[in-house]
């Protein structure tokens, strides 16, 4: 029997990156600069807080924190 591993919900402290395909199709993409930095799609960013369906993400760079919809974020898995 092969059971699927349940997906962990994102929470405060989770390491994430932005899913480019989902973000590009969102209403937020229409309201933002089309030339976004590559690091948001590469990760990792850390979730600082969650309010309803949005997460505040801090990148490991000297840039401001950013709010993204939770469905646009994916868990960052470090390469071994």
UniProtKB/Swiss-Prot annotation:
GO terms for cellular component: plasma membrane-derived thylakoid membrane. It holds the Pfam family NdhO. It is found in: Cellular thylakoid membrane. It catalyses: a plastoquinone + NADH + (n+1) H(+)(in) = a plastoquinol + NAD(+) + n H(+)(out); a plastoquinone + NADPH + (n+1) H(+)(in) = a plastoquinol + NADP(+) + n H(+)(out). Its EC number is 7.1.1.-. Coiled coil: none annotated. It is a peripheral membrane protein. GO terms for molecular function: oxidoreductase activity, acting on NAD(P)H, quinone or similar compound as acceptor; quinone binding. Signal peptide: none annotated. Disulfide bonds: none annotated. Keywords: Membrane, NAD, NADP, Plastoquinone, Quinone, Thylakoid, Translocase, Transport. NDH-1 can be composed of about 15 different subunits; different subcomplexes with different compositions have been identified which probably have different functions. NDH-1 shuttles electrons from an unknown electron donor, via FMN and iron-sulfur (Fe-S) centers, to quinones in the respiratory and/or the photosynthetic chain. The immediate electron acceptor for the enzyme in this species is believed to be plastoquinone. Couples the redox reaction to proton translocation, and thus conserves the redox energy in a proton gradient. Cyanobacterial NDH-1 also plays a role in inorganic carbon-concentration. Belongs to the complex I NdhO subunit family. This is NAD(P)H-quinone oxidoreductase subunit O. It comes from Prochlorococcus marinus (strain MIT 9515).
């Amino acid at each position: 029997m092969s059971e699927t591993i349940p997906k962990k919900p994102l929470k405060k402290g989770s390491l994430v990156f932005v899913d480019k395909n989902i973000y590009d199709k969102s209403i937020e993409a229409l309201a933002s600069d089309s030339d976004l930095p590559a690091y948001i799609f590469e990760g990792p960013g850390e979730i600082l807080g969650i309010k309803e369906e949005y997460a505040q993400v801090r990148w490991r760079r000297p840039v401001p924190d950013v709010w993204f919809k939770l469905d646009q974020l994916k868990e960052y898995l470090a390469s071994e």
